């Protein structure tokens, strides 16, 4: 996959299927990205429930409109429940986006997509996409997560750089 460096113009979008109530991690990373100065959009329930049956045409259309309307260029997907179900849900969306030329290397908007979930789910996603999708199994430190997403060092919030109080704070897109 081509590498597209993060720029201040990038807009991050987060999707999390409604059935999964683990919102803590999504909000944590969203707030950290906002602290770095990026615009972040967290999908509302309408989008998050569409994702559960994204193979239904009107559902995909809703998700696509959400992405294009908000000019989302970095897309995160979080799912902490059943690995096979989570992988299937994510991969269906991934292939629909790909078939629709939504990725930057195809001339589309989305410069990167990543998946946060249980280690087993991450392994399936990584395997089925030949490593094209970055995965977060949920034991990363905030700083590690931001670096892994490609956030430039000078954008990292001072609180992360200067204090150790985050050290015990395991970010998971998880909890």
Question: For each predicted feature, which ranges?
Answer:
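Serine/threonine-rich low-complexity intrinsically disordered regions
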Residues: 7, 50-53, 58, 82, ...
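Short, flexible coil/linker elements and helix-boundary hinge sites characteristic
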Residues: 3-5, 56, 71, 101, ...
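Flexible inter-domain linker/hinge segments
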Residues: 1, 142-175
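Short acidic-hydrophobic, aromatic-tinged amphipathic segments that line or gate anion-handling sites
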Residues: 133-142
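Acidic-enriched, low-complexity/disordered segments with a strong bias for Aspartate over Glutamate
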Residues: 5, 10, 20, 35, ...
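ATP-dependent carboxylate/acyl-activation modules
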Residues: 1-43
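Cofactor-cradling patches in redox/metallo enzymes
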Residues: 30, 39-132
């Amino acid at each position: 996959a081509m590498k597209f460096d993060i720029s201040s113009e990038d807009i991050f979008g987060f999707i999390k299927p409604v059935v999964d109530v683990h919102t803590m991690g999504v909000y944590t990373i969203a707030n950290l990205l906002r602290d770095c100065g990026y615009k972040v959009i967290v999908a509302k329930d309408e989008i998050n429930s569409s994702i559960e049956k994204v193979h239904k045409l009107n559902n995909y259309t809703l998700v696509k409109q959400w992405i294009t309307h908000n000019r989302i260029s970095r897309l995160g997907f979080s799912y902490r429940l059943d690995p096979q179900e989570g992988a299937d849900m994510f991969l269906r969306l991934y292939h629909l986006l790909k078939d629709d030329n939504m990725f930057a290397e195809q001339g589309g908007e989305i410069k990167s997509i990543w998946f946060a979930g249980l280690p087993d789910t991450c392994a399936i996603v990584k395997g089925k996409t030949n490593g094209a999708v970055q995965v977060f199994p949920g034991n990363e430190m905030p700083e590690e997560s931001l670096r892994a997403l490609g956030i430039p060092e000078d954008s990292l919030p001072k609180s992360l750089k200067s204090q150790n109080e985050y050290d015990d704070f395991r970010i998971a897109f998880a909890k």
